[in-house]
């Protein structure tokens, strides 16, 4: 997260000093300050609710949105409260003197107004906006206005480049001092699909540097970080993260504390609740994070299917060209693969179930989901071909040998240990205590699996907050079923969650049954 070092307040006024207090509220990527309405500072300075204020402690400064409170148990008249995220940024102890003053308005607001009016912005405009966003100068309303304006009047490809470049410039950028530094990313929308947890140990076992930082789930049943957290700690101090990447040649960590693209982190907090994921913002978000993390080579997975994020080959090709244009301008080597997104990848949806699938593949367990194994090997093979010593077309065989020989499992165990491993038995995973089965009502073939509906059911069951909750798929596309066969099993820890999930399955199970010729086809690379 971005903070500014300074000894002089931005607005030139003498700040008011109050005792710092930690307020245990998670405001998710928004700095929030709390003042008692009757404190002398409020009356003297004319502070208003939701105003932007500047807070300074021991030479570090952040900007925050102000909330006024009437309850002295939250903050007293001689105290300044800070939300969890804001408190952590200052790195100070509770009770130390903190200075608060009115913040200057964001200088980029005129550029924001032009974008709202539908005008095209230049490079300097985007840089000014991203700098103000990273420094928390924008209110939630202004952030929402920017996101919606960029979505309604779709950014042209030059604007996408300007936005991506600006996101990189306002954050930290790593330099690993070696080449190549590889990474992979999927644009999302497919439940399960935990290929990163297989690709990273395969590529790292080969000796290539793969610093994989991933997100937590916000609207999905599990992100890579949520699933890895079943096996190990994912919240690593920045210095420790860099150290272990050099030692292990890879990591599987949460990227939320690395400050690599702070403006993007703030924007995501607005985009996700609105379900806004426009092509331009998607490209800028993904590429800014990868370049800031020091990657020189990126493998990008674009799944397509009837219920995937991208639903046609034409749409996938347009997105591919936009990614390639921006990546080329930024000096990033990019390989885009368009993959099968007709159904979830793997059997489990939810952190524990997905971790089980990953370990089964690494252990070469006969029960391992074949689709997850095959996709991971193909992706890893493409990444290995970034190595100048690997001939084109040989990557898959090398990846398969690393997996089959147990080297990938050994490397994964080493990464898990370096990140503070947790006990996990994939043969007896710690699943949620309640469950019910969704059954086939006729003899037929599985002709469709709705990614969105199964993800929704898994979330209603409690995933990812309840690690053992989710959906375990027992029948995949094209497989025959008899009436009464279990299509999938839903796990939940609480009766209310189980009831919500059951109601959702009764309205729409997410699995279609029919004849073999009704199974949809999709022409993809793999």
Swiss-Prot record:
Cellular component aspect of the GO annotation: cytosol
Major enzyme class: transferase
EC number, as in UniProt: 2.4.2.4
Keywords from the UniProt entry: Glycosyltransferase, Transferase
Record-linked PANTHER family: THYMIDINE PHOSPHORYLASE (PTHR10515:SF0)
Protein's name in the database: Putative thymidine phosphorylase
Annotated family: Belongs to the thymidine/pyrimidine-nucleoside phosphorylase family. Type 2 subfamily.
InterPro entries in the record: Glycosyl_Trfase_fam3 (IPR000312), Glycosyl_Trfase_fam3_N_dom (IPR017459), Glycosyl_Trfase_fam3_N_dom_sf (IPR036320), Nuc_phospho_transferase (IPR035902), PYNP-like_C_sf (IPR036566), PYNP_C (IPR013102), Pyrmidine_PPase_CS (IPR017872), Thym_Pase_Put (IPR028579)
Keyword Coiled coil: no
């Amino acid at each position: 997260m971005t903070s500014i070092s300074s000894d002089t307040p931005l607005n030139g006024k003498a700040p008011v000093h109050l005792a710092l207090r930690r307020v245990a509220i998670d405001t998710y990527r928004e700095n929030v300050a709390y003042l008692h309405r009757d404190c002398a500072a409020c009356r003297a300075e004319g502070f208003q609710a939701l105003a932007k204020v500047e807070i300074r402690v021991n030479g570090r400064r952040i900007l925050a949105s102000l909330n006024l409170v009437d309850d002295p148990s939250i903050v007293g008249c001689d105290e300044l409260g800070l939300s969890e995220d804001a408190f952590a940024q200052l790195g100070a102890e509770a009770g130390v003197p903190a200075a608060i003053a009115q913040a200057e308005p964001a200088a980029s607001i005129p550029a924001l107004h032009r974008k709202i009016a539908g005008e095209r912005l230049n490079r300097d405009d985007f840089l000014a906006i991203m700098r103000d966003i990273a420094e928390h100068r924008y209110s939630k309303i202004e952030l929402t206005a920017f996101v919606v304006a960029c979505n309604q009047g779709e950014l042209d490809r030059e604007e996408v480049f300007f936005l991506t470049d600006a996101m990189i410039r306002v954050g930290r950028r790593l330099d690993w001092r070696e080449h190549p530094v590889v990474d992979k990313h999927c644009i999302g929308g497919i439940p399960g699909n935990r290929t990163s947890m297989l690709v990273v140990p395969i590529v790292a076992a080969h000796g290539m540097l793969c610093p994989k930082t991933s997100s937590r789930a916000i609207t999905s049943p599990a992100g890579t970080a949520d699933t890895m957290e079943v096996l190990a700690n994912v919240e690593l101090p920045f210095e420790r993260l860099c150290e272990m990447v050099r030692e292990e040649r890879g990591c599987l960590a949460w990227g939320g504390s690395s400050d690599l693209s702070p403006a993007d982190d703030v924007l995501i907090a607005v985009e996700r609740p609105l379900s806004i994921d426009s092509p331009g913002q998607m490209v800028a978000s993904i590429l800014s994070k990868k370049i800031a993390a020091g990657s020189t080579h990126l493998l990008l997975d674009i799944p397509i299917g009837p219920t995937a994020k991208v639903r046609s080959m034409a749409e996938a090709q347009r997105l591919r060209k936009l990614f390639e244009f921006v990546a080329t301008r930024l000096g990033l080597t990019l390989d885009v693969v368009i993959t099968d997104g007709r159904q979830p990848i793997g059997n489990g949806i939810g952190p524990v179930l997905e971790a089980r699938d990953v370990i089964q593949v690494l252990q070469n367990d006969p029960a391992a989901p074949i689709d997850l194994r095959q996709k991971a090997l193909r992706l890893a093979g493409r990444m290995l071909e970034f190595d100048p010593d690997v001939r084109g077309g040989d990557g898959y065989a090398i990846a398969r040998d690393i997996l089959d020989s147990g080297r990938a499992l050994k490397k994964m165990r080493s990464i898990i240990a370096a990140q503070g491993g947790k006990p996990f038995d994939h043969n007896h995973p710690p699943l949620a205590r309640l469950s019910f089965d969704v059954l086939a009502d006729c003899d037929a073939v599985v002709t469709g699996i709705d990614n969105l509906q199964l993800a929704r059911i898994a979330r209603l069951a409690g995933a990812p907050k309840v690690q053992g909750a989710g959906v375990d798929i027992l029948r995949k596309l094209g497989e025959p079923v008899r009436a009464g066969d279990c299509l999938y099993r839903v796990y939940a820890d609480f009766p209310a969650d189980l009831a919500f999930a059951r109601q959702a399955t009764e309205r729409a199970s997410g699995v279609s049954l029919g004849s073999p010729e009704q199974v949809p086809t999709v022409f993809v690379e793999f």
